[in-house]
Amino acid sequence: ANVLHQVTPFFLMCDCHDLGVSIGDNFTGKSIPPRDLPSRKTPFNDRLENVLSPDFSPNIFLYDNFPGGIGLSSALFEMRQEVLVACLQTIDGCPCEAGCPSCVGPVRETGEKAKQVARELLENLLLTGI
């Protein structure tokens, strides 16, 4: 969620405060703070262990941070592939080992595998054509 929130404003030519971000769970219908994410093995890559629980159906929501919206979300939807590629390039180009505020967020807040997990999720989103 952090890298999407950092990269998206460049495409929409807006400030990062113009966009809100939330991680949600389809299973419970609730928003989840990043530190409280459940865990399970990922079906995409055996190298990543304990990413999400089987009962967790995650979503990342980027939304207009203005009452009624100003069209940022619909514009973002149209350029979602380019944004995901840019997010992957941002992660790959960051010299940190496990995560930092410039890419996936500080390791103390996101965990030691956050950079690896974010990269894996982005690759799979791009493969599925989201």
Model-derived segments and their meaning:
Residues 1-130:
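Extended, highly charged accessory segments
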